């Protein structure tokens, strides 16, 4: 019979800390995706690697409250708080979508103290592409 291999370290001890190691990020990109149902805020470094993200749903808002400006403001505040602790000073903001949370998320980003290089609207606009869905009759 083969000898059992002795355990050097258990799995529990190997993952005691956070998996993501904190590194100083002086500049980043803040992506705000505002739909009518939810607002998602993602913070990346200049290469596009995700550092932090938050959405109205993860902040505790459920149902139709996720699309409100207050929910977007809370989501933006949560995402920015973590990167501000990592030392982010400058950022670019990319806003996408027609939702109500666009302005509220931008207001929360402005109030955070991070200097904004520019704010760009990257909402996809068709040049008369696919036919849009039929209008709702309520």
Curated annotation (Swiss-Prot):
A GO term for molecular function: structural constituent of ribosome
Subunit structure: Part of the 30S ribosomal subunit.
Lineage: Eukaryota, Viridiplantae, Streptophyta, Embryophyta, Tracheophyta
Family: Belongs to the universal ribosomal protein uS11 family.
Annotated compartments: Plastid, Chloroplast
Major place of residence: plastid
Keyword terms, alphabetized: Chloroplast, Plastid, Ribonucleoprotein, Ribosomal protein, RNA-binding, rRNA-binding
Protein name, entry field: Small ribosomal subunit protein uS11c
């Amino acid at each position: 019979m083969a000898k059992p291999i002795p355990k050097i370290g258990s799995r529990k001890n190997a993952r005691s800390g956070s998996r993501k190691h904190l590194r100083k990020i002086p500049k980043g990109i803040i992506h705000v995706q505002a739909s009518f149902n939810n607002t998602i805020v993602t913070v990346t470094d200049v290469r596009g690697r995700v550092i932090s993200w938050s959405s109205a749903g993860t902040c505790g808002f459920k149902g139709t409250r996720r699309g409100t400006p207050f929910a977007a403001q809370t989501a933006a505040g949560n995402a920015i708080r973590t990167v501000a602790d990592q030392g982010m000073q400058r950022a670019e903001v990319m806003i996408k979508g027609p939702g109500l949370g666009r302005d509220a998320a931008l207001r929360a980003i402005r109030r955070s103290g991070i200097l904004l290089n520019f704010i760009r609207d990257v909402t996809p606009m068709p040049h008369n592409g696919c036919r849009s869905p039929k209008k709702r009759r309520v």
